[in-house]
Amino acid sequence: MMGIGSKSRGRLQRAAAHVAAKGAVAACAIVATLSVAIAVEVGTANAPPASPATDQAPPEEVVVEGNHEGPRMWRVAKGDHTLWILGTITPLPRKMTWQSDSVEALLHETQEVLPAWPSIGVGANPFTAIRLYFTWRKIQKSPDHTKLQEQLPPELYARFSALKARYAPKDNKLDELRPMLAGGRLLDDALNVSGLTMRNEVQKEVLKLANKQGVKVHQTKMKVEDPVDVLKDLGDTPKDSEIACLAAIVSRLETDLGPMQARARAWALGDVDTLRSLPHSVDDRIACLAAVSTSERVRNLVIKAQDDWLIEAEDAMARNKSTLAVQSMDRLLGDDGILSQLRTKGYIVEGP
């Protein structure tokens, strides 16, 4: 039997590496799904409803100039140990300038920084990466391979199409995706056109400042033991739940892009009163979380990540005089939010 030549072997290795890289993309999809789910807290559902949007898209950039207090923090204390929590919001403008002076000053007295969510890993096995890639490709479309127009109620499809024409006119693949993925992709397109991003650039800047000052960053690690099965579970999401997710995203894009921009400016200025008064819709995240949470496997991962963060925050307080944490305001506030849970446990909580 003839052996494989060096050129053929090289081609096979490059092909395997390419597929493994695509598997990493699928792994990122799991991480993104869990990160969004972890950030959702239904306590914000009582926020003022969003008002109808105008025909104007939000401006490309929010720049906050001059001397302002900047983003505000909550103080959680027990004895002489203090946990400072910087509440963040999403989305934020890609090019937003915000005052980080208070964070920099606090880092001089802080022993540890706690990020908002765990580091979610799926392992580095190349065979797992390949399986992830092919599973991810398989679940991109609905099981019956029907297009969105055939799956959605006519009224919802008309609204979806109007938003697509405005924010993603050249994205011809949107109609081929399953409802939940189509909704997520349309949201990304709309935010991009509006100069917004769901990436936590604030946390990125805080961690950069912490590293610069030599402050320890303690991020919990959560390994997904069965990432292929998680993707399969996402692929088995009931169609009705997926359509509800897409419908909530459509409603948010129709009403909330302007308020998103106003919230970003209020956050950067540290204007908590305005931030609290502005419309804030989380219906899309709640609906999409409900969709992916039909999987017990995904639901348990989300619950574990949320519980682990609170445990880590309390542990950090116990071992440090001063700890700085970053956390979504969606998770902080509300009757069932993190701050309420800490109060129940006997901690002193002071708001901005």
Residue ranges and their predicted role:
Residues 3, 18, 37, 279-283:
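Glycine-centered signal
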Residues 1-18:
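N-terminal secretory signal peptides that target proteins for export/translocation
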Residues 24, 271-272, 321:
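Residue-level recognition of short, well-ordered coil/turn positions
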Residues 22-37:
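Bacterial N-terminal signal peptides
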Residues 49-65, 70-297:
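Structured, acidic catalytic/metal-binding patches in enzyme active sites
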Residues 288-352:
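A cross-kingdom marker for long, charged
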Residues 37-52:
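Boundary at the C-terminal end of the N-terminal hydrophobic targeting segment
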